[in-house]
Structures are given as structure tokens and as C-alpha cells.
Amino acid sequence: MSSTRILTALLLLSASLAPACKAQLGKNVMIPAGSDADHQLNAINAADPSQKLALIDTFAKSNPDPDFQIVADEQYVNYYLNAKQYEKAFEYGEKLFALDPNNYVNAVNMVRAAAEKGDHTKLFTYGEKANSILANYKAAPPPEGTNPDDWSRIRTEKLVSLRDDEDYVEEALIGGAYNAKDPAKRADYLVRFSKMYPNTPESEQALAVAATAYLQAQNRPKMLEVANGVLAKDPDNIDVLLLLADDYSERGEQLDKADTYAKKAVSLADTLKKPDNISDEEWQKKITIQKGWALSSEGQVSLQKKQSAQAVDSLSKASTLLRSNAGLYARNQYRLGFAYLNLKKTAEATKAFTEAASVDSPYRAMAEDKLSELGTAAKTPAHKKPS
């Protein structure tokens, strides 16, 4: 994390002040080199952690000027952050913002405190604050009397110097969003993340996950809003195509659209490029499940349309592909059982329901009920995980 903005320089005959630091945003507090304040800060920086707080207290009391209080609050924030006393860090961070609203380093430190504490509310509040400070700086006109070309160069250099902090904030935000346990909050955080980083691959992926989280939170209107928004920008987003195909086919709504989305997902699964950060084995497993999921949705569309033979064909193809995912596999076999029943193929239906009941999933009990109705409950094998 970036250091506190303590500006010092050689003591000149005219008692000159230290130059501004290019790597910071916010007020540049000038500390006269060789002054009492300079000596106090040097002592703070050199002190053992057990002695720092008393020295910071002394500095704050002996330098009441608002600019020096900025430096004091920065020292308090760093001390409490390193001591993992996060509430105290937040307290002094807010005091610092009151004196220096555009202090980017303070915003980054608050993000760090919130991330380490696991406080997602504060994490996004301060993350948005950090991004707002950067955005305002990028949009700011040249200061009065500054040549526009010089200003462009200075601004570029400063933004480059802040890149590591900017990357840290982004990573902290996306990590916090994905780790939020409540699906409704997770979805909201991911949408907020996307708004902060629009037109990026991370933004698109965040929205795709947000759509799924909204569905988990039983907020279907928001799921549809977010998912359709993703497809409007990226019609080939396989995750969203699968989500909508599954939702529509399961509910018996917009079946033609569901079928189109499912078929497109099957085609995309064969052409997707493997990301660099995933192994060949993991990638193969992922696309195998995606293709099986899409075929299962195709089969469900056919079931809804009373096209049982087509349903059997799609669901049978999906069966092999979904074996590594208990929930999807069990649901697919449950659907396949009904497709066979519609064709009056009781033996095949019994086999499909038996397979659905053989794995630990929400479909186990329903499959067992169907087997009981068919008079074959005694033949149900011991429950097991799919191979």
C-alpha cells in the first residue's frame, strides 16, 4: 500500500518547502525540511510500533494547522490499519476525508481496511469513492496557468504511478462481490462493480454472475433485466444463453427463444477458446457440462411442446455429458423419465428415474416417488454420486 504523503527536502537557505509528490491525488502538504514537524515525522517513521501511537498523538497536538492535521490523520490511518484495528482506521479515514476529500491514498487504505475486515458495505462505499476521485482527476481541466501539453504529461505520469493501487481496488471489489454469501447482495455488488468498470471483460462476467445470483435470490425480474442487458451487448455470452434457456424452458415460457438460445449454446461450446488461467482438464469439464446443460434445456423445450421423441434424443445426449454434476444430471434423467413415459416406454422410463434417484440431489425424492408409482421402488439402487 502506498506510503503516507510526507514531503521533505533539503533545507535551503530560504527555508524552502518540499516539492509536491507526483504519485498522489489530493492536497500536497508541504513540510519544511528540518522543522520540528519534520523531525517528529522522522521519529514516527523510525519508531517501534509500540511507540508510534504516542508519537503520532504528540505530532497531532503540537501541529493544529489543518494541513498538518491531514498528515496526522494519515499517520493514524496507517497505524491502525497495520494494527488491524479497522474501526479506528475508518474513524480517522473519515476525519481525513473531511479535510482532504480527494485523498486517493486514503480511499485505497479504506478499501484495504474494509476488505481485510470483510465489510462488503464499506468496501463498495470506499471503492466507489476511490473510483470517483480518479474519474474526477482524469476529467479535470489543466490548472490555471498550466500548459495543456504539460498537464497531459503530468496527469499521465501520475495515473501510471497509481496503477498498482487502482488494480488493487478493482481486485478487492470483485473479490468481495463474489465472496458475498447472500445472493441478493452478491448480485447488487456485482452490478455496482460493472458500473465502475464498464466495457471490460470483468464487467461482462460480473453481470453474468449477477444474473444467476438474482435468480438464486428469487428476483426473476432483475435476473431477466440484467441477463438481457448482457445479451444486448454480447449475443454470444454462453453463460447467459444457458441461464435464459434454462429459465424459459423450465417455466414453459418463450419456448422458441429458449430453444434458439440452447442450440446456440451447444454450438458455442464447441468453439469457445480456453482462457489462459484454467487447465485443459478443468476447461474440458466446464464445456462438457455447458453443452450437456444446453442439450437438457433443448429436451425440456421439446417436453413442453409435447415432442417426446425429440426430447428423448436431446436428453439422452445430455445424460453422458452431465454425469459430473449431480444436480443437472439428476434433473436431466428425471426429465428423460417423463419423455419415455409419454412414449409409453415404461422400462426406459424406470431406468431414467432410477438414475435420477441414484445421486444426491433435490430430484432424488421426486424420482423415488415416480418409481413407487411405477411399482419399481424396490429396484432403486443405493444412492451414489455420479461418476
Model-derived regions: residue spans:
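Structural motif corresponding to the intra-repeat A-B loop/turn of tetratricopeptide repeats
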Residues: 46, 83, 117, 180, ...
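Short solvent-exposed coil/turn linkers within tandem alpha-helical repeat scaffolds
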Residues: 62-69, 98-105, 135-146, 160-164, ...
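Terminal, low-structured helical/coil segments at or just beyond the last alpha-helical repeat
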Residues: 27-32, 165-171, 188, 275-277, ...
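"A position-specific structural signal for the A-helix of alpha-solenoid helical repeats
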Residues: 38, 75, 109, 171-175, ...
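N-terminal leader/linker segments that initiate helical-solenoid repeat arrays
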Residues: 17-75, 83-84, 125, 137, ...
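TPR/TPR-like (Sel1-like) alpha-helical repeat modules
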Residues: 112-139, 249, 259-270, 316, ...
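Residue-level recognition of tetratricopeptide repeat
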Residues: 78, 112, 178, 212, ...
